[in-house]
Each structure stands twice: as structure tokens, then as C-alpha cells.
């Protein structure tokens, strides 16, 4: 059997010779905590941030592969008072740079640096969008939380295919040299209806119950 992220991928799999009755469009399993309903206000209270400010979650994988300082500098030029939840993973050097930048920053944004965290689901519940590499797990967690995605630097192969699927179905945008992060964020936030449309699309395509569906299928086949 082949487990896929969505029914939208069934045709592609069949075209590659996989029998349709062997395709299980259950979605990608994620930790059950990403399925729990957590209000924005509750999530913000847990993090100690303002629930009424536009909040951007910046991630770069567990190794922190992203230039967060450069991204914050670009986004702060938009003029909107954002809150940045900056997750640096195990990249202690990047965490230090973000902490130093935050300590000397004098603009109208708020910067919250983090190292490796275990409460990504809370951060996603408190955020308006996520800026991240398109790794399969992060993408699946964001889908479960209906969190619009701005993606960068996909690895050739599976991450590029993740980007194609998400962008083609209106759930994400790809940050490039010709479509930089500040333009991507501005376009996402300048029209509130667009954010709502993206979230609605994600809720229709996401399978937050993927883990339960897959487990039930396996138990039936025993």
C-alpha cells in the first residue's frame, strides 16, 4: 500500500503504475497534539505574546537552516507591527545572532528567539503564517493547523514536489529571489480575505486524523 497526503495525489500515483486500490489517501501522520483545538488567545497566553498582533512563525528545520536575521530585517521594513516567533532549532550560532539582533532592535515589531522547541503546535496556533523549509513533517503539521505557508529553499526532489503540491492548490507561496519574503508576506496580509481563503482550502484538503485512520487500517488488516 501507498499512503499519500491527499486524494489529489491519486491520479499522479495511478499514472505511475500504482493500482488505485493500493493507494491510501489518509494524509501524513502527525502527533495527535496537532489535532487538538487550541484557541489563538490560549496559545498566545502560553507563549506570553499579544494575541492581537499579526504573528509570523519563522522556522528552518531542526538545524535552523535559515537566515532569520535577514528575514526579520526585510519584514520589519513593511511597516506592520509584527510579532516574530523565531525558532533556530539546534543552530546555537543563529540563536545567538537573533538574540543579539532582538536586544538592539528599536522598531515596532517584537522578536521572540527560541532554540529547539517542543511546543510547535502552540506556536502554530498563535501564528498567522509560517515561513519555513518545505520538509514533509513541518508541512503536514502546518496543514493540520490550517496555517498558511511561505516556503523557501526546497531540496531538489521530495521538497520540490511538496512545494508544487502546496502552491498549485493555493495553500502556500514559494519565496524566491524574484518573489522575496517581504513581498510574499505583504501580499498575504494585505487582503484579509486571502488569508481566510487559504485557511479554508487547507481545512478541506488536510487530514488531521491521518494517524488514527492509518492505525485503524493496519489493525483491520492484522
Regions found by a protein language model. Name each.
Residues 5-8, 90, 135, 177:
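Helix N-cap/beta->alpha junction signal
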Residues 123-161:
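A donor-sugar binding/catalytic signature common to diverse glycosyltransferases
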Residues 194-208:
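A short, well-ordered alpha-helix in the C-terminal region of glycosyltransferases
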Residues 207-222:
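C-terminal alpha-helical cap of glycosyltransferases
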